[in-house]
Amino acid sequence: MSSVKRLDINYKTDELFEDFRNFGNKDLYLVDELRGEMIDASSDSPFYGIYVGDCLGARMALYRKGEVEETHFPGFDDYNVIWKLEVLRDFQGRGYGTSLLDFAKDQGLPIKVIARNQSKDFFIKQGFTDLEETNRDGHDVLVWTP
């Protein structure tokens, strides 16, 4: 299993995210999220990643209920939200996305996820249930329960 690391909120992390901006999906950039967190330096980092050598090959933003969009998730008092999860193309198919999800599942809380970039089948394969709803941007909403 790959080692998931919490990413610091600083300009070095912004530099590490550069490869994702250059080669990744524009819906998953995390630019606004990172810069917003840098403004509030007192907050804990919601960003996690997997390094492959010196390269950040995979990353996710894992938030607690109330920190991001709360719609489409009735019936849960406390939960986490995987706001965005991305593995660079050169590192796909190596289990890094699954490792990030396993890390989130190990928190022991239900997880809500917005399936962007045709990732719905991946999340279903990982045990998520399709709520058969979409968010305001038209992305599918899925949930995992412990």
Swiss-Prot record:
Q: Which UniProt keywords apply?
A: Acyltransferase, Transferase
- So which residues are the signal peptide here? none
Q: Which Pfam families match?
A: Acetyltransf_7
Q: Where is the N-acetyltransferase domain?
A: 7-146
From what superkingdom does this record's organism come? Answer: Bacteria
Q: Quick check: keyword Acyltransferase in the entry?
A: yes
Q: InterPro entries from the entry?
A: Acyl_CoA_acyltransferase, GNAT_dom, YlbP
EC number(s)? Answer: 2.3.1.-
Instruction: Cite the GO molecular-function annotations of the record.
Output: acyltransferase activity, transferring groups other than amino-acyl groups
Matching PROSITE patterns: GNAT
Name the UniProt record assigns to this protein: Uncharacterized N-acetyltransferase SSP1595
Origin organism lineage:
Bacteria, Bacillati, Bacillota, Bacilli, Bacillales
